Amino acid sequence: MRLDNRGLQPPEPMQRTLKALEEMNIGDKLTIINDRKPMFLFEELEQKGYSYEVNSREDGAFEIIIIKKEG
């Protein structure tokens, strides 16, 4: 699954992302693209048992790949 959150104002990117994560099964992957690094999202992901990878894009946006882990 992929979400493009560019151009959205907070808290909409985080709300969209959390809603998509609720539908994920263990091992599923979600890729989001945000205008800025979602620092508050990282805390939430760690608490809920997701791993993530952050990549800077050439256009200045950030791509975050989120994987739901067991536990």
Regions found by a protein language model. Give the residues of each.
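Short, structured protein-protein interaction patches enriched in aromatics and acidic/basic residues
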Residues: 31-51
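Sterically constrained small-residue positions within well-ordered secondary structures
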Residues: 23, 43, 55-57
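C-terminal edge-of-domain segments
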Residues: 49-71
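Low-complexity, flexible helical/coil segments
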Residues: 12, 38-42, 66-71
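An N-terminal amphipathic alpha-helical segment
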Residues: 1-24
